[in-house]
């Protein structure tokens, strides 16, 4: 169920990014512009909220992934989140994740919901230091590092 509140900076939510449209030959369509196109983010995944008050119905989020990209990690565009930082969830294993700051985007609150735990729903924010690392990684990914040096 979609959220009906303004999430806090650093809050962990689940986002349904949708999927790629498939053409008649079974391949992902790269010319259908009313949906996602590779390599854009897809599927249900955890996200970190960076701004929950864009307007009445939008948030800026950074998706979390269990796939490490050594190159982007070394370039400071991905931030490692240790396996014990995010509480145990029903549909997401407790494991190392990476905040993919190069995939930061604005999404509708209709795409966002609280992730399920075994006894309800997750209500958790990342530590401030980790959120600051993710924010710096977003700045690096948009090639604006000179603004903070």
What are these regions (language model features)?
Residues 24, 56, 70-71, 108-111:
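Intrinsically disordered, low-complexity acidic/polar segments
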Residues 20-31, 37-38:
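Short, Lys/Arg- and Gly-enriched loop/turn segments at beta-strand edges
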Residues 2-5, 73-149:
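C-terminal terminal-subdomain/extension
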Residues 33-44, 49-87:
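Compact nucleic-acid interaction/catalytic patches
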């Amino acid at each position: 169920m979609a959220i009906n509140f303004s999430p806090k900076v650093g809050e962990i939510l689940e986002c349904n990014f949708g999927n790629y449209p498939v053409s008649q030959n079974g391949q992902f369509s790269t010319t259908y512009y009313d949906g996602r196109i590779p390599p854009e983010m897809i599927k249900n995944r955890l996200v970190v909220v960076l701004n929950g008050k864009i307007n009445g119905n939008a948030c800026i989020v950074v998706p979390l992934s269990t796939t490490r990209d050594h190159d982007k990690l070394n370039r400071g565009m991905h931030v490692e989140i240790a396996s014990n930082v995010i509480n145990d969830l029903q549909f997401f294993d407790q494991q190392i994740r990476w905040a993919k700051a190069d995939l930061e985007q604005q999404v509708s609150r209709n795409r966002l919901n609280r992730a399920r735990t075994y006894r309800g729903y997750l209500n958790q924010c990342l530590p401030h230091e980790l959120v600051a690392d993710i924010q710096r990684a977003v700045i690096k990914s948009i090639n604006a590092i000179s603004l903070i040096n």
